[in-house]
Structures are given as C-alpha cells and as structure tokens.
Amino acid sequence: MLTGAVARRYAQALLEIGIQTKTLDALEGELGRFVEMIGHPELQRFLFHPSIVVAEKKDLVGRLLATGAFSETARAFILLVIDRRRESYFADIFREFVRLANKVRNIEEARVTSAVELAPEQVERLRSQLAAATGKAIVLRMAVDPDLIGGLVVAFGDRIIDGSVAGKIRDLRESLLRSPLPSLS
C-alpha cells in the first residue's frame, strides 16, 4: 500500500475519534509531540529497526508515553500503529492528520516564499487578503528565497500564485522563445 494511502487511513480514523470525543486539538498536539520525540536518531533507529520485535517497541514507547502526559486515546493509537508495524509512517500520518483537521476547522495553509523577509504588517495584509479570497482562516508558512529577486510566490490548496520577478522573467523568456522571429529580408 502506498505511503499516502496508509497515512490517510490512520489519520482519518484518528480524526473521526477526535471529532466524536471533541479532542481534535489535544490529539494533534499529542501526535505532534510524539513525532518530535521519535525524531531523536537513537529512538528512530530502535523504533524503525525491522528485527526488533513489536513487543519491545511497544514496551519502550509505552514507558515514554507514560512520562509525557499523553491521553489514553493518543497512547492507544500510537501503540496500535506500532502493533501494525506502521511505525515508519508516523510523520506522514501526522501531516495528513493536520491537513484533515484543518479542513474540518475551515483552515487553509498557505506557503509564502518572498525574496526578502516581509514586515509583520505585510504578512497580516496578505493573510487577510487570502482569507477574503478563500473564505477560510489562513495559516501562513513563510520562507525567504533571494533567488526570486523580488515579489513573492504563494501556494495554497492546489493553486500557486507566482508574483516574483524571477517568475516574470521566466514567463517573458518562454514567451519570447515561442514567438516567431520576424524575417529580416
């Protein structure tokens, strides 16, 4: 089964539990903390090692979860994923869970790349314009890429708005290459 399909199935199941129990935010926080915990290289090597038996993995993770203030729902979910030998999918499950939870909350995530760091007022103006255009609350993920020369690129949902100088130069170049040259004779 493909990574995306596995992650989607587990994320959807946890989402439904979170909606039913009204613990969506808490589950997102707990799963995020767990994914951060297993980012530690030694723990990752242990957890993802194929010859370590499931019982040992569940024992160690169970002890870690007991010290980290995880709800019974989060603990049961994490241990179920390990029991099914899907531990290498935790980061993908978390990303998919956040995406699905944001959809339920009517939140759109937008990735904004600009040539220079934007001032807080510019960020807020961009956020409000995107919110007005989408009808959703907007969470911005900002990045800086000097190669854009100027302007910015906004990606959200299945849309990309390229307002960068580098993008305009690329478009102009492609337009010139497609245009037939006039005959000089």
Curated annotation (Swiss-Prot):
Protein's name in the database: ATP synthase subunit delta
UniProt keyword DNA damage, yes or no: no
Entry keywords, A to Z: ATP synthesis, Cell membrane, CF(1), Hydrogen ion transport, Ion transport, Membrane, Transport
GO cellular component terms, A-Z: plasma membrane; proton-transporting ATP synthase complex
UniProt family annotation: Belongs to the ATPase delta chain family.
Role noted for this protein: F(1)F(0) ATP synthase produces ATP from ADP in the presence of a proton or sodium gradient. F-type ATPases consist of two structural domains, F(1) containing the extramembraneous catalytic core and F(0) containing the membrane proton channel, linked together by a central stalk and a peripheral stalk. During catalysis, ATP synthesis in the catalytic domain of F(1) is coupled via a rotary mechanism of the central stalk subunits to proton translocation.
Subunit description: F-type ATPases have 2 components, F(1) - the catalytic core - and F(0) - the membrane proton channel. F(1) has five subunits: alpha(3), beta(3), gamma(1), delta(1), epsilon(1). CF(0) has four main subunits: a(1), b(2) and c(10-14). The alpha and beta chains form an alternating ring which encloses part of the gamma chain. F(1) is attached to F(0) by a central stalk formed by the gamma and epsilon chains, while a peripheral stalk is formed by the delta and b chains.
GO molecular function terms attached to this record: proton-transporting ATP synthase activity, rotational mechanism
